[in-house]
């Protein structure tokens, strides 16, 4: 079960139309309102069907705890399917909701909105630190266990030999410091490095199960970026116009950087023959679970990276040593991995994701090491420009012992470059196709880590795919292959930005996205209708994404809503601005919580400031109607 708990000034709803699964209700349930209440948006999930009574008991406990914290005795239970992509049957959902209502009714004033009805609702969130909380409730024994395919009525998932080997591979864990020393994890003092401590614990435990929703899940919805898609498989998302804009800007930026770096953009198929002899061998060397489908009596799998298509393309190419290093990139929309259901959450871990995947063919190991260094620096620069800095992630370096003994300087320089301790994983035996790889790992508010950028040195696949180049003597040779994702999955970049903002909010900072990624860069708020024409004039002087809040609301509410949307620049237009020709601008990046920073400048000065901030980055136009009164609500 998923709960979203909102401490509300008031919550009111009105039923509009019933769905095919709507419960029968009396007239009194067709509308409702509670003031000074805790609103519990609730999604009952399929896993709750095994023991509805346990789900009721745990939900009641969580709701009571929060009600005590916010000091309210009024509770509105509101069924909300959008909180989960794995819902229970309607019958069980109603049973659980009624059970929660009955259990709470003895101590609280409780109202329950009906299940299965389209409803108009308004909720006014109080906005204090405890006013927006989420809880994930799992029956005993399910939170940390993967769902077995046969139990879910699915085909047995395809699991590679490499993934099986990963579960049994013996790793030696060390901390590498910038001075080149390797330290035992158990004896190294991680106290000054709390995020590295969390990352080490996460990696060594290998527990990926989701126990509750991380903060970015609520943020991606409230900012109308993305949400779960109940009509698809778990781990497949929908992206609203604002989210599509952010996602496309990130995609375009990474492609621009890669092509400037010398990569050629290509496009390859989404599915491949599982029994193709070359591909089958590679499947068994890649640690991932695959989606499989049948087509024309052939068993196909959906790609989990661009390797397959690019390597098959490389096989058919005529390549000279003069062409090396040869780089190709594809923005894979989508790549697919059949991640275990219990590990899926928000944008952190998905089954369908967008991966920039670059491969570099190198003449020999010396050239591969040189390219590896360059691409390590490239990844740092890419994340820096996205808004994810060196201090925001932890570095993991993984290698075989033989490779390390021959390339210590390369490995140590990676720690020197970031100037902080890094986690090392070393193997005596090579289980995979690579001898060296690194990842930049973002550690979120729940101490869960997710890999972003990565580069790997691959010593197998040129042979496997029969990829060769003609050397200076006219003879065929095998290249060394680098795999690089300059940013990691695009969805994970959004996840990291949202999680970073959530953690900064807890530290008292004002959250925001980088200006170049903000769906609205400037919001103009006219005080009254007579100021609307001047607001339009100002908007035409701004060469950026600017919208106008023309709704019939108070100025205070308009400004607050702009703040909740993280708009970087908010311009209030009144008589003074019309008379003087300057504008009053709230600058979010310079503001503190409850202490906005304001400047009085001309529209031309504001435009120059924004153009400077977004210089060198991709640009797209406003994704929604310019006037807020013309916009629909997505969440």
Swiss-Prot record:
The N-terminal domain is an archaea-specific tRNA-editing domain that hydrolyzes incorrectly charged L-seryl-tRNA(Thr). Catalysis of tRNA editing is performed by the charged tRNA itself. Residues 215-514 are annotated as: Catalytic. Residues 1-152 are annotated as: Editing domain. This is Threonine--tRNA ligase. GO terms for cellular component: cytoplasm. One of its GO terms (biological process) is threonyl-tRNA aminoacylation. The keyword Transit peptide does not apply. Its main location: cytoplasm. Belongs to the class-II aminoacyl-tRNA synthetase family. Zn(2+) binds at residues 307, 359, 483. Transmembrane segments: none annotated. It is found in: Cytoplasm. GO terms for molecular function: ATP binding; threonine-tRNA ligase activity; tRNA binding; zinc ion binding. Homodimer. Its EC number is 6.1.1.3.
